[in-house]
């Protein structure tokens, strides 16, 4: 399996969703559940880092009158 940080965002999210689904089913032996949880935490961290990187890129792209404009993406998403 590819290292978590090397996975594209979409693939990491798919794997994370699959892990969560399996853990929620409750049919996983304890040791396997712990390993799956650790893998899920790694995937979650990787996705978070990728989102932060994209947010910084978007902040740099968004210009107004030639000036860099900070954008709060959460507020804009809710509008």
From Swiss-Prot:
<comment type="subunit">
    <text>Heterooligomer composed of large and small subunits.</text>
</comment>
<keyword id="KW-0540">Nuclease</keyword>
<comment type="function">
    <text>Bidirectionally degrades single-stranded DNA into large acid-insoluble oligonucleotides, which are then degraded further into small acid-soluble oligonucleotides.</text>
</comment>
<keyword id="KW-0378">Hydrolase</keyword>
<dbReference type="GO" id="GO:0008855">
    <property type="term" value="F:exodeoxyribonuclease VII activity"/>
</dbReference>
<dbReference type="GO" id="GO:0005829">
    <property type="term" value="C:cytosol"/>
</dbReference>
<keyword id="KW-0963">Cytoplasm</keyword>
<comment type="similarity">
    <text>Belongs to the XseB family.</text>
</comment>
<dbReference type="InterPro" id="IPR037004">
    <property type="entry name" value="Exonuc_VII_ssu_sf"/>
</dbReference>
<dbReference type="InterPro" id="IPR003761">
    <property type="entry name" value="Exonuc_VII_S"/>
</dbReference>
<protein>
    <recommendedName>
        <fullName>Exodeoxyribonuclease 7 small subunit</fullName>
        <ecNumber>3.1.11.6</ecNumber>
    </recommendedName>
</protein>
<dbReference type="GO" id="GO:0009318">
    <property type="term" value="C:exodeoxyribonuclease VII complex"/>
</dbReference>
<dbReference type="GO" id="GO:0006308">
    <property type="term" value="P:DNA catabolic process"/>
</dbReference>
<dbReference type="Pfam" id="PF02609">
    <property type="entry name" value="Exonuc_VII_S"/>
</dbReference>
<keyword id="KW-0269">Exonuclease</keyword>
């Amino acid at each position: 399996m590819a290292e978590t940080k090397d996975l594209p965002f979409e693939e990491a999210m798919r794997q994370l969703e699959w892990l969560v689904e399996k853990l929620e089913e409750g049919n996983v032996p304890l040791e396997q559940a712990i390993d799956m949880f650790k893998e899920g935490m790694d995937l979650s961290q990787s996705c978070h880092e990728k989102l932060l990187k994209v947010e910084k890129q978007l902040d740099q792209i968004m210009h107004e009158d030639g000036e860099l404009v900070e954008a709060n993406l959460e507020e804009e998403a809710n509008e």
